[in-house]
Every structure is written in structure tokens, then in C-alpha cells.
Amino acid sequence: MKISFIEPAILLYAFAMTLTIPLTAQYVYRRIWEETGNYTFTSSSNVSECEQNKSSSTFAFQEEVQKKASLFSLQVEISGLIPGLVSTFMLLSSSDNHGRKLPMVLSSLGSLGTNLWLCAMSYFDLPLQLLVASTFIGALFGNYTTFWGACFAYIVDQEKEYKHRIIRIAVLDFMLGVVTGLTGLSSGYFIRELGFAWSYFIIAVVVLVNLAYILFFLSDPIKESSSQIVTMSCSESLKDLFYRTYMLFKNGSCKRRSLLCLLIFTLVVYFFVVFGITPVFTLYELGPPLCWNEVYIGYGSALGSLSFLSSFLGIWLFSYCLKDIHIAYVGIFTTMVGMMLTAFTRTTLMMFLVRISFFFTIMPLSILRSMLSKVVHSTEQGVLFACIAFLETLGGVTSTSAYNGIYSATVAWYPGFVFLLSAGLLVLPAVSLCMVKCIGWEEGSYTLLIHDEPSEHTSDS
């Protein structure tokens, strides 16, 4: 008997992803350190190997390592851009007809293969450039945006009422906060006690368990239409996929199209900033003046992950006195303040305190996704989340590439510049939300917008 709870799959995947990101960043940093300096990276119980005297040759060496690590991360992200975009768009768009489980299964297979390859690389000390190839191959199966997009569409399929939907998403954010917080807290101890190879192996086992749950225990609310598969060729299916995407923006009134485009723009730009700055945080904390080791980075990651928990509480409390659009404003402006404060942080205590200003960072992402789901028909949820995941994949790779490039170019004269730049970029989603408000967004207006749509959502040819 199959069940319809997507939450276990999301939490297991979140554990794997949350542990993989800091592990990979530190693994790349250490490998480049050892290859550049020809000696083994060591870490004390308090701080990492870090020289704070700018006149020292070691300080210049550290800056060189940070530049190389940032540029290598840029290469890795770019390698997965094109296959990730194509696979994400096609898998999620086709999930309206073929079910939500297929994107989850394939993206989990890609994650499993990538972590097994990282395990082999760290165990056998294989060339670091092979990470670029594994990222490219893994992206062919989809990536994290593919998995999250399918999960959000799965929840929307089950929860027809908007209030129930947003509560379930908020509860999910709460659970994600607990899992990612504990994972981030333990990531440093994983590295110190188990090393990179065994840590990646544990992640691979978790992904394998998650894959088994999705395949054998999770039900699919979208039933596969066998007649459509028989009568439609591959080219016709691809044509139908693009046609439904085109109709998503063509159907409905001018107000609906304007709201849809503005909300997608707001979500993508905000995601661009928040996701792009994440790997820079690790590099910023590893270098002077903070000079954190893997345990402190784990503490920082855990504190940052509390934004899922605090965002859940924020949505729950603010929903009693604020409208959706105002809740999104709170998250954007508090994140903007946090970026500006981080740029001027020079001590460990201040860095921990600055993390508090990021406690509502996830709120706009949850709210904007819920707002978007209100302006499209239930049969278009897969296409909508395919577009969102496609743009998030493009924005995610572009942002991490851009931020890594900017950080490597500015780390020598001012490491905090990227955070000031992020604060400035957050003005764009704030202005976009103002335009949404001016057009006339109302909490219950989505019903009228959906009724504006034609009943046909698929191609007749």
C-alpha cells in the first residue's frame, strides 16, 4: 500500500544536499591548498590555517587559494548549466501527464551518482578536474531545482485550498529548518571524525534510501495517460510541451499575465541573490579576518539553516496581521540588512549575530511560490513549476558563477564587496513587488484570474 506523504522524501533529500554543499566547498578548498602549497592542510581545534598579517607571504598564499577555489567552483557550476536547464524543463513540464515521481527519481539518481563519485575522488585522491565531468553527467538527470519543483507541484496537486497549501508549505519549511540546522551543525564533525570519503558515502546511502521510498512507497496523484503515450511521438510530445508553456503566458487577461511575469521575476531575482551568495559565505568565513575551521563553519551553517524554522514561525505569526505581499517585504528587507551588516563584519561573535538578520530569508520564497500557484489552473501547475525550476537553475548557476567570479576579483581589496552588491540587487524584487501591488493584487483575486483562462490547456495538433 502506497502513501501520499512527500515530506520524508523532501527531508532526506534536504539532509543530503545540506551536507554535500559545505563538504564539497571545503574539500575543494583543501585540495587546492595542498596542490598550491605542496603541503597538507591541517586544522586546529579553534581556527583554520589562516594568516591575518597582510604583509606575510602566507597571507598572499591564502588569497591565491581563495581565488583558485572560487574560479574552480565557477567551472563546476558552468559545467552543469546546459544539461541542468534542459533536463529540469523537460522533466517538470512532462510531469503534468506522466506523474511527479519521474523527476524525483531521476534527480535522486543524479545525486546518488555524484556523491559516489565524490567518495571515490576523495578516497583515491583522483584529479580534482574530474569533479567538472561528474557535475555535467549528474545534471543530465536533473538537479535540486528539479526535485524541489516536482515536490511543490506534488503538494499543490494534493492541497486544492490555498490556506491549506500555504500551511503545509510553512510546516515543511519548519521541518526543513530542523533537518538542515542539525545537518549544518554536524557537518564539521563529519569532516573531522569521518573524513570526506566516508561522509560522502553516508550521503549516498541516505539518497539511496530516499530513492527506495519514492519508488516503492510514495503514491503519485497524477495518473499516467497510456493512450497519450501511444499516440504521441517524441517530436509531438516535445511540441506539446512547448505549446503548453506558451499557453501558460498567453491565456487569461492582461492582468493575469502581468502578475505572472512580475511574480516570476521577483522570485527568480531574489533566488539569484540568496542562492548565489551561499557558497561565498563559506569562502568568506575560511579566510581572514574570520579564519574559521570546519566546526565553526558547521555552526554558522546550522545558524543559517534556522531561517527555515524562523521563516515558518514568521509566516504563521504574520499571516494573522499582514497580507502575503507584506510578508514577502519583511523577508526581503531583513535579508538586505543582513547583507549590509555581513560586509562590515570582522569578528566571530559579530558573524554569528549577523546571521540573526537572515532569519526571515526563506519567507519570500515560500510566499511567492504560493502566490504564483494561485494565478494558474490546476492542470498548469507542472508547467508553472517547470518554468520556475528552469529559471532557478539558470539563475542559480549564473549567480554562483557570477558571485565566485566577483569574489575572486575583489577578495584582495575588499572581501565584503559581494555582500554590498547583494544588498543593492535586492532592491529589484522590492520594486517588482511594488508593481504587483499597484496592478491590484488581492488575496482572493486568484479565483477570478483562473476563471479567465480557456478550458483547453493542451495542443490539439
Swiss-Prot record:
Mode of membrane association: Multi-pass membrane protein
Subcellular location: Lysosome membrane
Biological process terms in GO annotation: cellular response to 2,3,7,8-tetrachlorodibenzodioxine; vacuolar transmembrane transport
UniProt entry keywords in alphabetical sequence: Glycoprotein, Lysosome, Membrane, Signal, Symport, Transmembrane, Transmembrane helix, Transport
Keyword Transferase annotated: no
Major site of localization recorded for this protein: membrane
Catalytic activity: estrone 3-sulfate(out) + n H(+)(out) = estrone 3-sulfate(in) + n H(+)(in); 25-hydroxyvitamin D3 sulfate(out) + n H(+)(out) = 25-hydroxyvitamin D3 sulfate(in) + n H(+)(in); cholate(out) + n H(+)(out) = cholate(in) + n H(+)(in); glycocholate(out) + n H(+)(out) = glycocholate(in) + n H(+)(in)
Cytoplasmic side: 92-103, 157-170, 219-260, 323-324, 369-381, 437-461
Signal peptide: 1-25
Residues carrying a glycan: 38, 46, 53
Extracellular side of membrane: 26-70, 125-135, 192-197, 282-301, 346-347, 403-415
Record keyword Glycoprotein present: yes
Function: Lysosomal proton-coupled steroid conjugate and bile acid transporter. Preferentially recognizes lipophilic steroid conjugates or bile acis as endogenous substrates and seems to mediate escape from lysosomes to the cytoplasm. Modulates hepatic cytosolic copper homeostasis, maybe acting as a lysosomal copper transporter and sequestering copper ions in the lysosome. Delivers pathogen-associated molecular patterns to cytosolic pattern recognition receptors as part of the innate immune response to microbes.
Family stated for the protein in its record: Belongs to the major facilitator superfamily. SLC46A family.
UniProt protein name: Lysosomal proton-coupled steroid conjugate and bile acid symporter SLC46A3
Name of the coding gene: Slc46a3
